[in-house]
Amino acid sequence: AAEVATMRRFGESGRFIGLSDTWTLNEDWFTAVSVGAGDGAAYLPRYRVDGFVNRKLLASRQWVATLGAGYYRAPDGHIDRNISLGSTYYFESPWVVQAEVRFNNSSPGQVRTHQQFVAATWGRAKQTQVIARHGWGAEGYQAIGGGASLVNFDSRQTQLTLRQWVGPQWGFTAGVERYSNPFYDRNGAKLSLFWELP
């Protein structure tokens, strides 16, 4: 799948492009890889790479356990490396619930933090999906423009996203979010287009 997004934060416009793909190894195992890059905006990655290994559990294979790893390089030079553990349960349509914890090591300074999130999805792929997500925990670094960064702080983020297919392989996502940390609060919106490779 491919995604192109545009946004504006801290008085600076930014654009992000991402690519992702999933490979089915057998009826129980599958993997996923995503790569992405920003256009130089301070709050977007210069580039990032994330990979996941997934194992279907139970006789029904409705429960999926996930192990992930990621690398994030920011325009200001700091680097994040993370490992994540996740769990997803597919109820009878149209509900899916998900939880994840991520352990992050940021440099310079070897700042170690962790975050977690829970999410619920209503709807069906290739049609309409509504996703509610809440995350909380600590962040190692966050660029806020003008060469300034926040270091090792707690934050919370709540998002509501609509993912709508327009054609067999493409559509759009539209979402709103509420983000807060000890230094500022942010309310925002995001609009992006996606295209799923055949």
What are these model-predicted stretches?
Residues 23, 55-57, 89, 122-124, ...:
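Residue-level signature of outer-membrane beta-barrel architecture
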Residues 2-6, 19, 33-37, 49-51, ...:
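Transmembrane beta-barrel strands of outer-membrane/channel proteins
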Residues 1-2, 27-33, 58-66, 93-99, ...:
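Repeated loop/turn-to-beta-strand initiation elements of outer-membrane beta-barrel proteins
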Residues 120, 186-198:
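Outer-membrane beta-barrel "beta-signal"
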Residues 5-12, 20, 36-44, 56-60, ...:
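Outer-membrane beta-barrel domain signature
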Residues 41, 119-121, 125-171:
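Outer membrane beta-barrel transmembrane domains
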Residues 1-16, 193-196:
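N-terminal entry module detector
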Residues 13-17, 45-49, 79-83, 110-116, ...:
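Residues that define the transmembrane beta-barrel architecture of outer-membrane proteins
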